[in-house]
Each structure stands twice: as structure tokens, then as C-alpha cells.
From Swiss-Prot:
Residues modified as N6-(beta-hydroxybutyryl)lysine: K5, K10, K15, K19, K24, K28, K57, K80, K123
Short name of any one Pfam family annotated for the protein: Histone
Positions bearing the site annotation: Interaction with ZMYND11: S32
Function statement: Variant histone H3 which replaces conventional H3 in a wide range of nucleosomes in active genes. Constitutes the predominant form of histone H3 in non-dividing cells and is incorporated into chromatin independently of DNA synthesis. Deposited at sites of nucleosomal displacement throughout transcribed genes, suggesting that it represents an epigenetic imprint of transcriptionally active chromatin. Nucleosomes wrap and compact DNA into chromatin, limiting DNA accessibility to the cellular machineries which require DNA as a template.
Pathology noted in the entry: Glioma: Gliomas are benign or malignant central nervous system neoplasms derived from glial cells. They comprise astrocytomas and glioblastoma multiforme that are derived from astrocytes, oligodendrogliomas derived from oligodendrocytes and ependymomas derived from ependymocytes. Bryant-Li-Bhoj neurodevelopmental syndrome 1: An autosomal dominant disorder predominantly characterized by global developmental delay, impaired intellectual development, poor or absent speech, and delayed motor milestones. Clinical manifestations are highly variable, including abnormal head shape, dysmorphic facial features, oculomotor abnormalities, feeding problems, and non-specific brain imaging abnormalities. Additional features may include hearing loss, seizures, short stature, and mild skeletal defects.
Effect of R43K: Reduced binding of histone H1 to histone H3.3-containing nucleosomes
Modification N6-butyryllysine occurs at: K10, K19, K24
Consequence the record notes for mutating A30P: In BRYLIB2; uncertain significance
Protein name: Histone H3.3
């Protein structure tokens, strides 16, 4: 293809280029003089989804053992004083408690999704328990 000669043409309207030299220079020099780097933040929801995947993969107990043990002993005091517990009994209670709570939160999440929400609320827990027949 043969080359053709370019002729100068008059511009027809269009935006004139703005002068950004001063602002660009100021923007580039400002962070370097401050020296304080902004900490990295993930977008809202990213960490929550990562935690959901992590805890769904794992099988370890999520409630700390000693606080749970204190709670069990405190509740048992109302029924009989000076009760003693085997460590396996406390472990079984904790396993059952966490399994119950996980199931309840799964049902609660379904109730929230049914209401076209992504945030669970106390009314979702109440509805889930009512459907299960745990509470009238």
C-alpha cells in the first residue's frame, strides 16, 4: 500500500487538553513525603466468605473448652450442688451443643434467604425453632 501525504487540518471543536502537570506532580510527591502506608483492607464480605469456607472444612470445636466447662458447671449447680463431671462428659456435651447450634444457624440462614435477606435476625432464629417444633 502506498503512503499518502498527511495534510494539516483545522480542529473542529473537541475538548482542549487540560493542564494536569501541577496536580499530577503534587499527587505523586504527597504519599512519598508522608511515609505512612495505608493498611491493606479486603472488600466487605471477602473475609467473611473465607471464614465460612475455612470453618466448613474444619472439624475442631469452635467454643473454647474452659469457658464451656464453666457454663456447664454453672447450669448444673441449679439442679444439684457438688456435681462432678468426667472430661469425656463435658466433651460430649460440647460436641452436641455445637452440632445443635450449627444446625440451628443453617436453618436460620434458610429463613433469612426465604425472606429475601442475607442477614440473619432474631426473628429468623425464632421461626426456625418454631418450624422445628422446639418452641410454640
Amino acid at each position: 500500500m502506498a503512503r499518502t501525504k498527511q495534510t494539516a487540518r483545522k480542529s473542529t471543536g473537541g475538548k482542549a487538553p487540560r493542564k494536569q502537570l501541577a496536580t499530577k506532580a503534587a499527587r505523586k510527591s504527597a504519599p512519598s513525603t508522608g511515609g505512612v502506608k495505608k493498611p491493606h483492607r479486603y472488600r466487605p464480605g471477602t473475609v467473611a466468605l473465607r471464614e465460612i469456607r475455612r470453618y466448613q472444612k474444619s472439624t475442631e470445636l469452635l467454643i473454647r473448652k474452659l469457658p464451656f466447662q464453666r457454663l456447664v458447671r454453672e447450669i448444673a449447680q441449679d439442679f444439684k450442688t457438688d456435681l462432678r463431671f468426667q472430661s469425656a462428659a463435658i466433651g460430649a456435651l460440647q460436641e452436641a451443643s455445637e452440632a445443635y447450634l450449627v444446625g440451628l444457624f443453617e436453618d436460620t440462614n434458610l429463613c433469612a434467604i426465604h425472606a429475601k435477606r442475607v442477614t440473619i435476625m432474631p426473628k429468623d432464629i425464632q421461626l426456625a425453632r418454631r418450624i422445628r417444633g422446639e418452641r410454640a
